[in-house]
């Protein structure tokens, strides 16, 4: 008998498996329909010995000390600050838009104060910010919106920015300085030996059993368990009772080239007529040294594995119906991007999983106290319980993982 069946071995499922096993002493079975752990963050060494991300670039960044220290139990880190260029008008320009972007695009020599005035002069103020188009046009005007955002967003989401919630483009800042970092989070780093090795360390516990190439529907009636943690698509769980929730998918084209460097930045965006949205060169991300280099093209599409919930009002309304079903389903916990139909970053999923663990473990401990009290022992009614949850004030030393380079 397992205490928990966890569906999905990505961040949400793996964090909860580790916490329940190591933190609460529970027996956990975690399954995944794919042939590997790690979810979309899975990485591996290709035939040339280069570490690549199978499902596109995954850049770790967070402002949460708790999340960073928790993951540091399972990996050492390679310091990395992400940078992106956009191919616009035949030039490779920094994105998010900053002072250098404007000066190079228009052949100007503005200062930080002057570029702020420039943005104000081209901005088209919107009385209400409802859509992704509103966000950008209100901030930097129509021309920059057309050059950097419109086509990229249409390719990525299959919809015009005027049809998408403001949240999509609100994630991308506009800067008046020369800061070319894509993120400004306190903690920016990549797992030194890759994400997969980190997940292996996370799931390396005697209370955890992993089953791959396994659909949970095939085992839930034959393997006994007490509760389920589900990280897959919520509409699938309920057999599409209210219809299928739309997700965007991706197709990846991986290539290896016989030269050390392919492009001048880790990622180059193509907000124009190319079918792909961006090209990523992995050695920038991993810090690996190799005579060859590997890249990946990303082609957004409507069908395929679900990657991104589509942020539109009508979709949120359908999800609300599924959430009501989820809340009313006993002994099943819905966690992660697909199960809660939200566009989470990796650190946000880890934080959600840690919070879920605290709630589960706290509730179980409180139930145990009540049972003890009912038997004449333990705390008396009305006695306050200490705060329950996980503290990670110390970074535990990761196990030695060997040499990162397999070239």
Regions found by a protein language model. Give the residues of each.
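Hydrophobic/small residue at the entry helix of a nucleotide-binding pocket
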Residues: 12-13, 37
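Beta1/beta-strand and adjacent pyrophosphate-binding region of the FAD-binding site
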Residues: 1-12
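C-terminal segments that line or cap access tunnels to active or ligand-binding sites in enzymes
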Residues: 226, 235-369
